[in-house]
Amino acid sequence: MAAAAVTGQRPETAAAEEASRPQWAPPDHCQAQAAAGLGDGEDAPVRPLCKPRGICSRAYFLVLMVFVHLYLGNVLALLLFVHYSNGDESSDPGPQHRAQGPGPEPTLGPLTRLEGIKVGHERKVQLVTDRDHFIRTLSLKPLLFEIPGFLTDEECRLIIHLAQMKGLQRSQILPTEEYEEAMSTMQVSQLDLFRLLDQNRDGHLQLREVLAQTRLGNGWWMTPESIQEMYAAIKADPDGDGVLSLQEFSNMDLRDFHKYMRSHKAESSELVRNSHHTWLYQGEGAHHIMRAIRQRVLRLTRLSPEIVELSEPLQVVRYGEGGHYHAHVDSGPVYPETICSHTKLVANESVPFETSCRYMTVLFYLNNVTGGGETVFPVADNRTYDEMSLIQDDVDLRDTRRHCDKGNLRVKPQQGTAVFWYNYLPDGQGWVGDVDDYSLHGGCLVTRGTKWIANNWINVDPSRARQALFQQEMARLAREGGTDSQPEWALDRAYRDARVEL
Protein backbone atom coordinates (compact mmCIF):
# COMPACT_ATOMS: atom_id res chain seq x y z
CA MET A 1 0.00 0.00 0.00
CA ALA A 2 1.32 3.44 -0.90
CA ALA A 3 2.32 5.44 2.11
CA ALA A 4 0.58 8.73 2.74
CA ALA A 5 2.64 11.17 4.80
CA VAL A 6 0.48 13.71 6.60
CA THR A 7 1.44 16.96 8.27
CA GLY A 8 -0.84 18.91 10.55
CA GLN A 9 -3.77 17.62 12.59
CA ARG A 10 -5.62 14.80 10.79
CA PRO A 11 -8.48 12.47 11.78
CA GLU A 12 -7.36 9.30 13.55
CA THR A 13 -6.76 6.40 11.18
CA ALA A 14 -9.29 3.61 11.69
CA ALA A 15 -8.49 -0.08 11.72
CA ALA A 16 -9.04 -1.88 8.42
CA GLU A 17 -12.60 -3.06 8.03
CA GLU A 18 -13.55 -5.81 5.64
CA ALA A 19 -17.00 -5.58 4.16
CA SER A 20 -18.93 -6.87 1.23
CA ARG A 21 -18.98 -5.03 -2.05
CA PRO A 22 -20.19 -1.46 -1.37
CA GLN A 23 -23.66 -0.46 -2.47
CA TRP A 24 -22.85 2.00 -5.18
CA ALA A 25 -26.21 3.34 -6.29
CA PRO A 26 -27.64 6.67 -7.41
CA PRO A 27 -28.94 8.76 -4.50
CA ASP A 28 -32.61 9.48 -3.88
CA HIS A 29 -32.68 12.75 -1.96
CA CYS A 30 -30.05 14.55 0.09
CA GLN A 31 -32.35 15.83 2.78
CA ALA A 32 -34.09 12.53 3.24
CA GLN A 33 -30.81 10.73 3.79
CA ALA A 34 -29.54 13.43 6.10
CA ALA A 35 -32.68 13.13 8.22
CA ALA A 36 -32.22 9.39 8.38
CA GLY A 37 -28.60 9.79 9.46
CA LEU A 38 -27.18 7.92 6.46
CA GLY A 39 -23.56 8.40 5.47
CA ASP A 40 -22.24 7.78 8.98
CA GLY A 41 -21.76 4.03 8.81
CA GLU A 42 -21.21 0.93 6.73
CA ASP A 43 -24.80 0.79 5.49
CA ALA A 44 -24.50 3.95 3.42
CA PRO A 45 -21.32 3.79 1.33
CA VAL A 46 -22.79 5.98 -1.41
CA ARG A 47 -24.17 9.44 -0.85
CA PRO A 48 -26.08 11.67 -3.23
CA LEU A 49 -24.57 14.85 -4.50
CA CYS A 50 -25.57 17.51 -1.98
CA LYS A 51 -25.33 21.27 -1.54
CA PRO A 52 -21.82 22.56 -2.38
CA ARG A 53 -19.82 23.91 0.50
CA GLY A 54 -17.26 25.96 -1.39
CA ILE A 55 -17.20 28.70 -3.96
CA CYS A 56 -14.79 29.15 -6.87
CA SER A 57 -14.51 32.92 -7.07
CA ARG A 58 -15.80 34.51 -10.26
CA ALA A 59 -13.31 37.32 -9.64
CA TYR A 60 -10.47 34.83 -9.48
CA PHE A 61 -11.76 33.14 -12.63
CA LEU A 62 -11.78 36.43 -14.54
CA VAL A 63 -8.25 37.32 -13.51
CA LEU A 64 -7.06 33.82 -14.32
CA MET A 65 -8.52 34.09 -17.80
CA VAL A 66 -6.56 37.32 -18.32
CA PHE A 67 -3.21 35.80 -17.47
CA VAL A 68 -3.73 32.33 -18.93
CA HIS A 69 -4.56 34.04 -22.24
CA LEU A 70 -7.77 32.25 -23.11
CA TYR A 71 -9.82 33.56 -25.99
CA LEU A 72 -12.28 36.34 -25.18
CA GLY A 73 -15.27 36.65 -27.54
CA ASN A 74 -17.80 39.37 -28.15
CA VAL A 75 -19.89 40.03 -25.06
CA LEU A 76 -23.00 40.88 -27.01
CA ALA A 77 -22.80 37.60 -28.92
CA LEU A 78 -22.40 35.84 -25.60
CA LEU A 79 -25.53 37.42 -24.17
CA LEU A 80 -27.49 36.51 -27.27
CA PHE A 81 -26.22 32.95 -27.06
CA VAL A 82 -27.22 32.64 -23.41
CA HIS A 83 -30.64 34.17 -24.15
CA TYR A 84 -31.47 31.96 -27.10
CA SER A 85 -29.94 28.83 -25.56
CA ASN A 86 -31.67 29.09 -22.19
CA GLY A 87 -34.69 31.16 -23.11
CA ASP A 88 -36.60 33.55 -20.88
CA GLU A 89 -38.33 31.56 -18.18
CA SER A 90 -40.84 34.33 -17.62
CA SER A 91 -42.16 34.33 -21.19
CA ASP A 92 -44.08 31.89 -23.33
CA PRO A 93 -42.07 30.86 -26.40
CA GLY A 94 -45.26 30.72 -28.47
CA PRO A 95 -46.81 27.92 -30.49
CA GLN A 96 -44.68 28.49 -33.59
CA HIS A 97 -41.46 28.25 -31.60
CA ARG A 98 -42.63 25.09 -29.87
CA ALA A 99 -43.64 23.50 -33.14
CA GLN A 100 -40.25 24.10 -34.73
CA GLY A 101 -38.21 22.98 -31.72
CA PRO A 102 -36.30 19.69 -31.65
CA GLY A 103 -38.48 18.29 -28.88
CA PRO A 104 -37.65 17.58 -25.23
CA GLU A 105 -33.97 17.71 -24.37
CA PRO A 106 -32.46 14.38 -23.33
CA THR A 107 -31.87 14.04 -19.60
CA LEU A 108 -29.45 12.02 -17.50
CA GLY A 109 -29.87 10.41 -14.12
CA PRO A 110 -27.96 11.43 -10.97
CA LEU A 111 -24.25 10.76 -10.64
CA THR A 112 -22.93 8.33 -8.05
CA ARG A 113 -20.33 9.36 -5.51
CA LEU A 114 -18.47 7.12 -3.07
CA GLU A 115 -18.87 7.97 0.62
CA GLY A 116 -15.58 8.57 2.40
CA ILE A 117 -16.88 7.62 5.90
CA LYS A 118 -13.67 8.76 7.65
CA VAL A 119 -9.96 8.99 6.96
CA GLY A 120 -8.43 5.53 7.11
CA HIS A 121 -11.69 3.70 6.40
CA GLU A 122 -11.22 0.61 4.22
CA ARG A 123 -13.69 -1.43 2.22
CA LYS A 124 -13.32 -4.50 0.05
CA VAL A 125 -14.45 -4.49 -3.57
CA GLN A 126 -14.18 -6.97 -6.42
CA LEU A 127 -13.18 -5.21 -9.61
CA VAL A 128 -11.71 -8.29 -11.34
CA THR A 129 -12.69 -11.93 -11.06
CA ASP A 130 -9.47 -13.35 -9.63
CA ARG A 131 -8.74 -11.00 -6.71
CA ASP A 132 -10.15 -8.48 -4.28
CA HIS A 133 -9.15 -4.85 -3.96
CA PHE A 134 -9.30 -2.59 -0.92
CA ILE A 135 -10.29 1.08 -1.12
CA ARG A 136 -8.84 3.30 1.61
CA THR A 137 -10.04 6.83 2.34
CA LEU A 138 -7.13 9.28 2.38
CA SER A 139 -9.06 12.51 2.94
CA LEU A 140 -12.59 13.89 3.03
CA LYS A 141 -11.71 17.32 1.59
CA PRO A 142 -11.19 16.52 -1.22
CA LEU A 143 -12.91 13.14 -1.24
CA LEU A 144 -9.78 11.12 -1.98
CA PHE A 145 -9.17 7.36 -2.07
CA GLU A 146 -6.30 4.93 -2.63
CA ILE A 147 -6.42 1.41 -4.12
CA PRO A 148 -3.18 -0.61 -3.87
CA GLY A 149 -2.68 -3.13 -6.66
CA PHE A 150 -5.31 -1.66 -8.97
CA LEU A 151 -2.94 -2.47 -11.86
CA THR A 152 -0.62 -5.46 -12.06
CA ASP A 153 3.10 -4.96 -12.67
CA GLU A 154 2.63 -6.38 -16.18
CA GLU A 155 -0.15 -3.88 -16.94
CA CYS A 156 2.04 -1.02 -15.73
CA ARG A 157 4.91 -2.12 -17.95
CA LEU A 158 2.57 -2.50 -20.93
CA ILE A 159 1.23 1.06 -20.55
CA ILE A 160 4.77 2.44 -20.41
CA HIS A 161 5.74 0.37 -23.45
CA LEU A 162 2.74 1.55 -25.49
CA ALA A 163 3.46 5.17 -24.55
CA GLN A 164 7.08 4.84 -25.63
CA MET A 165 6.04 3.25 -28.92
CA LYS A 166 3.63 6.10 -29.64
CA GLY A 167 6.13 8.76 -28.57
CA LEU A 168 5.86 11.40 -25.85
CA GLN A 169 5.83 15.15 -26.29
CA ARG A 170 6.88 17.87 -23.90
CA SER A 171 4.08 18.87 -21.54
CA GLN A 172 3.49 22.58 -21.30
CA ILE A 173 0.79 25.19 -20.93
CA LEU A 174 1.20 27.91 -23.53
CA PRO A 175 -0.85 30.85 -24.79
CA THR A 176 -3.43 30.18 -27.48
CA GLU A 177 -3.03 31.43 -31.04
CA GLU A 178 -5.79 33.96 -30.40
CA TYR A 179 -3.81 35.63 -27.61
CA GLU A 180 -3.16 38.97 -29.35
CA GLU A 181 -6.79 39.26 -30.43
CA ALA A 182 -7.91 38.38 -26.91
CA MET A 183 -5.88 41.21 -25.44
CA SER A 184 -7.19 43.69 -28.00
CA THR A 185 -10.80 42.82 -27.18
CA MET A 186 -10.37 42.79 -23.38
CA GLN A 187 -13.20 44.78 -21.82
CA VAL A 188 -11.71 45.02 -18.30
CA SER A 189 -10.37 48.40 -17.22
CA GLN A 190 -7.11 48.82 -15.33
CA LEU A 191 -9.09 50.00 -12.31
CA ASP A 192 -11.33 46.92 -12.36
CA LEU A 193 -8.32 44.65 -12.70
CA PHE A 194 -6.57 46.39 -9.81
CA ARG A 195 -9.61 45.92 -7.60
CA LEU A 196 -9.80 42.23 -8.45
CA LEU A 197 -6.16 41.72 -7.54
CA ASP A 198 -6.28 43.85 -4.38
CA GLN A 199 -7.61 41.14 -2.08
CA ASN A 200 -7.18 43.03 1.21
CA ARG A 201 -8.58 46.27 -0.25
CA ASP A 202 -5.73 48.41 1.06
CA GLY A 203 -5.13 50.21 -2.23
CA HIS A 204 -1.79 48.48 -2.87
CA LEU A 205 -0.81 45.26 -4.64
CA GLN A 206 1.55 43.18 -2.53
CA LEU A 207 3.60 40.44 -4.20
CA ARG A 208 1.54 37.64 -2.69
CA GLU A 209 -1.68 39.20 -3.96
CA VAL A 210 -0.31 39.19 -7.50
CA LEU A 211 1.07 35.66 -7.11
CA ALA A 212 -2.22 34.32 -5.76
CA GLN A 213 -4.04 35.33 -8.93
CA THR A 214 -1.40 35.21 -11.66
CA ARG A 215 -0.04 31.71 -11.34
CA LEU A 216 1.65 31.42 -14.69
CA GLY A 217 2.59 33.24 -17.84
CA ASN A 218 3.86 31.57 -21.01
CA GLY A 219 4.25 28.37 -18.99
CA TRP A 220 6.55 30.17 -16.55
CA TRP A 221 5.96 29.63 -12.84
CA MET A 222 5.75 33.00 -11.12
CA THR A 223 7.75 33.58 -7.93
CA PRO A 224 8.36 36.75 -5.88
CA GLU A 225 11.76 37.04 -7.54
CA SER A 226 10.38 36.67 -11.08
CA ILE A 227 7.62 39.21 -10.39
CA GLN A 228 10.17 41.78 -9.22
CA GLU A 229 12.36 41.09 -12.25
CA MET A 230 9.36 41.73 -14.48
CA TYR A 231 8.48 44.95 -12.62
CA ALA A 232 12.02 46.20 -13.20
CA ALA A 233 12.02 45.23 -16.89
CA ILE A 234 8.77 47.05 -17.70
CA LYS A 235 9.43 49.89 -15.21
CA ALA A 236 6.21 49.19 -13.32
CA ASP A 237 7.65 49.77 -9.83
CA PRO A 238 9.71 52.99 -9.85
CA ASP A 239 10.55 52.92 -6.14
CA GLY A 240 11.48 49.21 -6.24
CA ASP A 241 9.60 48.27 -3.07
CA GLY A 242 7.76 45.34 -4.70
CA VAL A 243 4.38 46.97 -4.01
CA LEU A 244 2.25 48.63 -6.69
CA SER A 245 0.02 51.56 -5.85
CA LEU A 246 -3.09 52.24 -7.90
CA GLN A 247 -1.24 55.04 -9.68
CA GLU A 248 1.72 52.80 -10.52
CA PHE A 249 -0.58 50.06 -11.75
CA SER A 250 -2.58 52.52 -13.87
CA ASN A 251 0.61 53.78 -15.49
CA MET A 252 1.64 50.25 -16.46
CA ASP A 253 0.89 49.15 -20.03
CA LEU A 254 -0.43 45.58 -19.84
CA ARG A 255 0.85 44.98 -23.35
CA ASP A 256 4.39 45.48 -22.03
CA PHE A 257 3.69 42.83 -19.40
CA HIS A 258 2.59 40.29 -22.01
CA LYS A 259 5.47 41.14 -24.34
CA TYR A 260 7.85 40.49 -21.48
CA MET A 261 6.22 37.17 -20.65
CA ARG A 262 6.31 36.11 -24.29
CA SER A 263 9.99 36.97 -24.68
CA HIS A 264 11.18 35.31 -21.48
CA LYS A 265 12.98 32.00 -22.04
CA ALA A 266 12.47 29.93 -18.91
CA GLU A 267 14.60 27.03 -17.75
CA SER A 268 12.92 23.67 -17.13
CA SER A 269 13.05 24.28 -13.39
CA GLU A 270 11.13 27.55 -13.86
CA LEU A 271 8.21 26.00 -15.73
CA VAL A 272 4.77 25.24 -14.35
CA ARG A 273 5.38 21.62 -15.27
CA ASN A 274 8.43 19.71 -16.39
CA SER A 275 7.37 16.42 -17.97
CA HIS A 276 6.54 14.57 -21.20
CA HIS A 277 3.23 12.91 -22.05
CA THR A 278 1.14 11.11 -24.64
CA TRP A 279 -2.44 9.84 -25.00
CA LEU A 280 -3.53 6.21 -25.36
CA TYR A 281 -6.96 5.30 -26.73
CA GLN A 282 -8.95 2.75 -24.72
CA GLY A 283 -11.99 2.09 -26.91
CA GLU A 284 -12.77 -0.42 -29.65
CA GLY A 285 -9.65 -1.42 -31.54
CA ALA A 286 -7.31 -0.59 -28.66
CA HIS A 287 -5.11 -3.17 -26.94
CA HIS A 288 -7.29 -5.56 -24.93
CA ILE A 289 -5.48 -4.63 -21.70
CA MET A 290 -6.28 -0.96 -22.29
CA ARG A 291 -9.95 -1.80 -22.77
CA ALA A 292 -9.90 -3.99 -19.65
CA ILE A 293 -8.48 -1.14 -17.54
CA ARG A 294 -11.25 1.19 -18.70
CA GLN A 295 -13.85 -1.44 -17.76
CA ARG A 296 -12.23 -1.72 -14.33
CA VAL A 297 -12.53 2.05 -13.91
CA LEU A 298 -16.17 1.78 -14.99
CA ARG A 299 -16.86 -0.78 -12.26
CA LEU A 300 -14.97 1.33 -9.71
CA THR A 301 -16.84 4.57 -10.38
CA ARG A 302 -20.29 3.01 -11.06
CA LEU A 303 -20.94 5.79 -13.53
CA SER A 304 -22.78 5.17 -16.77
CA PRO A 305 -20.78 3.49 -19.57
CA GLU A 306 -21.50 6.46 -21.85
CA ILE A 307 -19.83 8.90 -19.45
CA VAL A 308 -16.74 6.76 -18.85
CA GLU A 309 -16.25 5.54 -22.41
CA LEU A 310 -16.67 9.01 -23.92
CA SER A 311 -14.20 10.59 -21.52
CA GLU A 312 -10.63 11.52 -22.38
CA PRO A 313 -8.16 8.87 -23.51
CA LEU A 314 -5.58 7.70 -20.99
CA GLN A 315 -2.84 10.29 -20.49
CA VAL A 316 0.58 8.77 -19.76
CA VAL A 317 3.18 11.10 -18.22
CA ARG A 318 6.92 10.69 -17.66
CA TYR A 319 8.81 12.86 -15.17
CA GLY A 320 12.57 12.64 -15.45
CA GLU A 321 14.97 13.59 -12.68
CA GLY A 322 14.15 17.20 -11.85
CA GLY A 323 10.58 16.81 -13.11
CA HIS A 324 7.69 18.42 -11.25
CA TYR A 325 4.18 19.82 -11.63
CA HIS A 326 3.20 22.78 -9.46
CA ALA A 327 -0.11 22.55 -7.61
CA HIS A 328 -3.22 22.95 -9.74
CA VAL A 329 -6.79 21.73 -10.06
CA ASP A 330 -7.81 19.39 -12.88
CA SER A 331 -11.06 21.20 -13.69
CA GLY A 332 -11.98 24.79 -14.36
CA PRO A 333 -15.10 26.57 -13.09
CA VAL A 334 -17.97 26.70 -15.56
CA TYR A 335 -20.07 29.84 -15.85
CA PRO A 336 -22.47 30.92 -18.60
CA GLU A 337 -19.41 32.39 -20.35
CA THR A 338 -17.67 29.00 -20.64
CA ILE A 339 -17.98 25.67 -22.39
CA CYS A 340 -16.35 22.37 -21.56
CA SER A 341 -13.61 21.09 -23.85
CA HIS A 342 -15.28 17.72 -24.29
CA THR A 343 -18.77 19.02 -25.15
CA LYS A 344 -17.75 21.94 -27.36
CA LEU A 345 -18.82 19.87 -30.39
CA VAL A 346 -22.44 20.42 -29.38
CA ALA A 347 -22.02 23.90 -27.86
CA ASN A 348 -22.20 27.30 -29.50
CA GLU A 349 -18.69 28.14 -30.74
CA SER A 350 -19.16 31.84 -29.91
CA VAL A 351 -18.85 31.25 -26.16
CA PRO A 352 -15.52 32.92 -25.29
CA PHE A 353 -14.06 30.66 -22.59
CA GLU A 354 -13.20 26.97 -22.79
CA THR A 355 -12.21 24.81 -19.84
CA SER A 356 -11.65 21.20 -18.83
CA CYS A 357 -14.59 19.59 -17.03
CA ARG A 358 -13.29 16.56 -15.15
CA TYR A 359 -15.70 15.15 -12.61
CA MET A 360 -13.16 12.61 -11.36
CA THR A 361 -9.44 11.97 -11.60
CA VAL A 362 -8.17 8.38 -11.47
CA LEU A 363 -4.36 8.45 -11.26
CA PHE A 364 -2.20 5.32 -11.65
CA TYR A 365 1.40 4.99 -10.48
CA LEU A 366 3.23 2.94 -13.11
CA ASN A 367 6.57 2.50 -11.33
CA ASN A 368 8.33 2.88 -8.00
CA VAL A 369 10.22 6.16 -7.81
CA THR A 370 13.71 6.14 -6.33
CA GLY A 371 13.50 9.65 -4.88
CA GLY A 372 10.71 12.22 -4.56
CA GLY A 373 7.78 12.34 -6.97
CA GLU A 374 5.00 12.24 -4.37
CA THR A 375 1.55 13.57 -5.20
CA VAL A 376 0.87 16.40 -2.77
CA PHE A 377 -2.50 17.80 -1.69
CA PRO A 378 -1.44 21.03 0.06
CA VAL A 379 -4.77 21.83 1.76
CA ALA A 380 -6.33 18.38 2.16
CA ASP A 381 -8.72 18.31 5.13
CA ASN A 382 -8.02 21.90 6.11
CA ARG A 383 -10.87 23.31 8.18
CA THR A 384 -11.19 26.24 5.76
CA TYR A 385 -9.83 27.27 2.38
CA ASP A 386 -8.47 30.70 1.55
CA GLU A 387 -6.59 31.45 -1.66
CA MET A 388 -4.39 34.00 0.08
CA SER A 389 -3.40 31.56 2.82
CA LEU A 390 -1.55 29.45 0.25
CA ILE A 391 1.24 32.03 0.30
CA GLN A 392 2.62 32.92 3.72
CA ASP A 393 5.92 34.73 4.19
CA ASP A 394 8.39 32.90 1.93
CA VAL A 395 6.34 29.70 1.64
CA ASP A 396 4.12 29.08 -1.39
CA LEU A 397 2.26 25.83 -0.79
CA ARG A 398 1.64 25.49 -4.53
CA ASP A 399 5.38 25.34 -5.24
CA THR A 400 6.12 21.62 -5.50
CA ARG A 401 9.84 22.07 -6.09
CA ARG A 402 10.54 23.86 -2.83
CA HIS A 403 7.65 23.30 -0.43
CA CYS A 404 6.15 19.85 -1.01
CA ASP A 405 7.04 18.92 2.55
CA LYS A 406 4.70 21.67 3.80
CA GLY A 407 1.60 20.13 2.18
CA ASN A 408 -1.03 18.44 4.35
CA LEU A 409 -1.04 15.13 2.48
CA ARG A 410 1.56 13.40 0.32
CA VAL A 411 1.06 10.09 -1.47
CA LYS A 412 4.20 8.13 -2.27
CA PRO A 413 4.26 6.52 -5.73
CA GLN A 414 4.00 2.74 -5.63
CA GLN A 415 3.72 0.68 -8.78
CA GLY A 416 0.16 -0.45 -9.51
CA THR A 417 -1.50 1.79 -6.91
CA ALA A 418 -4.36 4.03 -8.01
CA VAL A 419 -5.64 7.15 -6.27
CA PHE A 420 -8.87 8.83 -7.27
CA TRP A 421 -10.77 11.91 -6.21
CA TYR A 422 -13.72 14.13 -7.13
CA ASN A 423 -12.89 17.53 -8.61
CA TYR A 424 -16.35 19.05 -8.12
CA LEU A 425 -18.59 19.55 -5.14
CA PRO A 426 -22.16 18.22 -5.48
CA ASP A 427 -24.91 20.61 -6.54
CA GLY A 428 -27.72 19.15 -4.41
CA GLN A 429 -29.58 17.85 -7.46
CA GLY A 430 -27.54 14.78 -8.34
CA TRP A 431 -25.08 16.58 -10.59
CA VAL A 432 -21.85 18.59 -10.31
CA GLY A 433 -21.58 21.97 -8.65
CA ASP A 434 -18.59 24.21 -7.96
CA VAL A 435 -14.99 23.11 -8.30
CA ASP A 436 -13.67 21.66 -5.04
CA ASP A 437 -10.83 23.99 -4.03
CA TYR A 438 -9.44 21.29 -1.75
CA SER A 439 -8.64 19.16 -4.83
CA LEU A 440 -5.57 21.36 -5.37
CA HIS A 441 -2.69 18.94 -6.00
CA GLY A 442 0.72 18.71 -7.65
CA GLY A 443 3.65 16.47 -8.46
CA CYS A 444 6.62 16.87 -6.12
CA LEU A 445 10.14 17.21 -7.47
CA VAL A 446 11.66 13.92 -8.68
CA THR A 447 15.04 13.92 -6.98
CA ARG A 448 16.27 10.53 -8.24
CA GLY A 449 15.22 8.28 -11.09
CA THR A 450 12.12 8.53 -13.29
CA LYS A 451 8.43 8.72 -12.44
CA TRP A 452 5.68 7.28 -14.68
CA ILE A 453 1.99 7.92 -14.07
CA ALA A 454 -1.24 7.70 -16.05
CA ASN A 455 -4.45 9.73 -15.71
CA ASN A 456 -7.97 8.57 -16.46
CA TRP A 457 -10.13 11.70 -16.33
CA ILE A 458 -13.89 11.22 -16.21
CA ASN A 459 -15.55 14.10 -18.03
CA VAL A 460 -18.94 15.49 -17.05
CA ASP A 461 -20.38 18.81 -18.21
CA PRO A 462 -21.94 20.81 -15.33
CA SER A 463 -24.81 21.38 -17.76
CA ARG A 464 -26.74 18.13 -17.56
CA ALA A 465 -28.60 18.90 -20.79
CA ARG A 466 -25.38 19.62 -22.70
CA GLN A 467 -23.77 16.41 -21.41
CA ALA A 468 -26.82 14.48 -22.61
CA LEU A 469 -26.66 16.14 -26.03
CA PHE A 470 -22.97 15.30 -26.28
CA GLN A 471 -23.62 11.63 -25.53
CA GLN A 472 -26.48 11.63 -28.01
CA GLU A 473 -24.27 13.12 -30.73
CA MET A 474 -21.47 10.63 -30.09
CA ALA A 475 -23.97 7.78 -30.34
CA ARG A 476 -25.22 9.18 -33.65
CA LEU A 477 -21.68 9.39 -35.02
CA ALA A 478 -21.07 5.79 -34.04
CA ARG A 479 -24.30 4.65 -35.73
CA GLU A 480 -24.00 6.66 -38.92
CA GLY A 481 -20.28 7.03 -39.45
CA GLY A 482 -19.28 3.38 -39.68
CA THR A 483 -15.60 2.60 -39.25
CA ASP A 484 -14.57 6.09 -40.39
CA SER A 485 -16.45 7.98 -37.68
CA GLN A 486 -16.16 6.06 -34.45
CA PRO A 487 -15.96 7.81 -31.06
CA GLU A 488 -12.16 7.55 -31.28
CA TRP A 489 -12.18 10.12 -34.07
CA ALA A 490 -14.65 12.31 -32.22
CA LEU A 491 -12.63 12.15 -29.02
CA ASP A 492 -9.41 13.01 -30.82
CA ARG A 493 -11.11 16.14 -32.12
CA ALA A 494 -12.82 16.96 -28.84
CA TYR A 495 -9.57 16.75 -26.85
CA ARG A 496 -7.21 18.25 -29.37
CA ASP A 497 -6.75 21.27 -27.07
CA ALA A 498 -7.31 19.51 -23.74
CA ARG A 499 -5.61 21.32 -20.89
CA VAL A 500 -5.25 21.28 -17.13
CA GLU A 501 -6.62 24.39 -15.46
CA LEU A 502 -4.48 26.25 -12.96
Curated annotation (Swiss-Prot):
User: Which parts of this chain are annotated as the region Disordered?
Assistant: 1-29, 89-111
Q: What do we know about what induces or represses this protein's expression?
A: By hypoxia in many cultured cell lines.
What reaction gets catalysed by this protein?
L-prolyl-[hypoxia-inducible factor alpha subunit] + 2-oxoglutarate + O2 = trans-4-hydroxy-L-prolyl-[hypoxia-inducible factor alpha subunit] + succinate + CO2
Q: Where are the transmembrane segments?
A: 61-81
Cofactor list? Fe(2+); L-ascorbate
Q: How does it sit in the membrane?
A: Single-pass type II membrane protein
- Topological domains, Lumenal: 82-502
Q: Which residues are glycosylated?
A: 348, 368, 382
Q: Please report the stretch or stretches of sequence annotated as the Fe2OG dioxygenase domain.
A: 310-460
Q: Which UniProt keywords apply?
A: Calcium, Dioxygenase, Disease variant, Endoplasmic reticulum, Epilepsy, Glycoprotein, Intellectual disability, Iron, Membrane, Metal-binding, Oxidoreductase, Repeat, Signal-anchor, Transmembrane, Transmembrane helix, Vitamin C
Residue numbers on the Cytoplasmic membrane side: 1-60
Cofactor comment text: Binds 1 Fe(2+) ion per subunit.
Q: Which Pfam families match?
A: 2OG-FeII_Oxy_3, EF-hand_7
Q: What does the record say about PTM? A: Glycosylated.
Q: Which domain of life is it from?
A: Eukaryota
What InterPro entries does UniProt report for this protein, alphabetically? Answer: EF-hand-dom_pair, EF_Hand_1_Ca_BS, EF_hand_dom, Oxoglu/Fe-dep_dioxygenase_dom, P4HA-like, Pro_4_hyd_alph, Pro_4_hyd_alph_FE2OG_OXY
A GO MF annotation of the entry reads: calcium ion binding
Q: What class of enzyme is it?
A: oxidoreductase
Instruction: Please state the Enzyme Commission number of this protein.
Output: 1.14.11.29
Disease implication from the record: Hypotonia, hyperventilation, impaired intellectual development, dysautonomia, epilepsy, and eye abnormalities: An autosomal recessive neurodevelopmental disorder characterized by global developmental delay, poor or absent speech, hypotonia, variable ocular movement and visual abnormalities, and respiratory difficulties. Disease onset is in infancy and death due to respiratory insufficiency may occur.
Summary of the function given for this chain in its UniProt record? Catalyzes the post-translational formation of 4-hydroxyproline in hypoxia-inducible factor (HIF) alpha proteins. Hydroxylates HIF1A at 'Pro-402' and 'Pro-564'. May function as a cellular oxygen sensor and, under normoxic conditions, may target HIF through the hydroxylation for proteasomal degradation via the von Hippel-Lindau ubiquitination complex.
Give the protein name, as stated in the record.
Transmembrane prolyl 4-hydroxylase
Q: Report the source organism.
A: Homo sapiens
Taxonomic path: Eukaryota, Metazoa, Chordata, Craniata, Vertebrata
